[in-house]
Amino acid sequence: MFDKIEELEIRYQELESLLAVPTVIANQPEFRKLSREHNDLTGLVEAYRRYKKVLAEIEGNRELLADPEMKEMAEAELEDLERQQEELEGEIKLLLLPKDPNDDRNVILEIRAGTGGDESALFAGDLFRMYSRFAERNRWKVEVMSASESERGGFKEVVALIEGQAVFAKLKYESGTHRVQRVPETEAQGRIHTSACTVAVLPEAEDIEIDINPVDLKIDVYRASGAGGQHVNKTESAVRITHLPTGIVVECQDERSQIKNRSKAMKVLKSRILDGLQQEQNARIAADRKQQVGSGDRSERIRTYNFPQGRMTDHRIGLTLYRLDALMEGDIAEVVDSLRAHYQMEALKAQAEAA
């Protein structure tokens, strides 16, 4: 393990030198590529350097054990240093796990109302607000790509692009069925209703990855409409694109310009096609090894939001929090971090079993 890290540390030093070369700085695509590689290695190299420093201090304290006057102090420091060594070894093992190539990407977030009618649409709006607030906390940018509003509020469907640092890494475990239990405002008897929404988190596709043949596209234009179906635009600015080979359909009517709507729809379409291809690949890998860590099966119920109890439970990791108001305002870092830690440990176990 440490031989591999030594090689990576040498590569890290090479990258630091390259990033200071004027010709590299002038070549922006190459500079960005090397910068990403440098950033990817920074955490590991820094942890390894701390680890080497702790090992040197442990060795020095062991030498002091032979000195009667220094023995007691050396033993106390040695205990703390050995604890640090163990923690750093665990951190380094996590940092050595194969990185999801999509982790640094922007995402296409799709939220759809499911069972529960109007209440489900209202909850879709609540979820979108929650993720938007979380994005603000992380200084991410949120851009609505398309939205189908419900007459009583919320969304039948909302699709948004979220741009920023490590967006997919933090949001990828949000894909799945989110269930809500609460008393609707229209419920006179005070009975709790259960409804659900589905959330999909797709890594944004880059143009170079998805090459779509124009022949495979059916493009329809129509007038944009608002809640209830009334037309809100006299020109045919809304766009519906169908990818004939896969049957994927994307609609966009958010902008007044047909060109802008077409551009947004194509961005969503490419991301959905890329996600489908990656899911097929993941399924093949899972079948080969009989196991898939963090499959993100979208058909399963992953989380319940119980408003009368002020409770949120994530069923995958058994995490229950009784501060639902704060969570719905985007304070979900604890949930996100717990999920990432859980699936990292699952990956470590799988790696150990395969060794």
Swiss-Prot record:
Post-translational modification: Methylated by PrmC. Methylation increases the termination efficiency of RF1.
Localization: Cytoplasm
Gene Ontology annotations for the cellular component aspect, listed alphabetically: cytoplasm
Family matches, as Pfam families: PCRF, RF-1
Keyword terms of this UniProt record: Cytoplasm, Methylation, Protein biosynthesis
Protein name (database record): Peptide chain release factor 1
Record-listed N5-methylglutamine modification sites: Q230
Organism domain of life: Bacteria
Molecular function GO terms recorded: translation release factor activity, codon specific
Function: Peptide chain release factor 1 directs the termination of translation in response to the peptide chain termination codons UAG and UAA.
Gene name tied to this protein: prfA
HAMAP family: Rel_fac_1
Family the UniProt entry places it in: Belongs to the prokaryotic/mitochondrial release factor family.
UniProt keyword annotation of Protein biosynthesis present: yes
Transmembrane segments: none
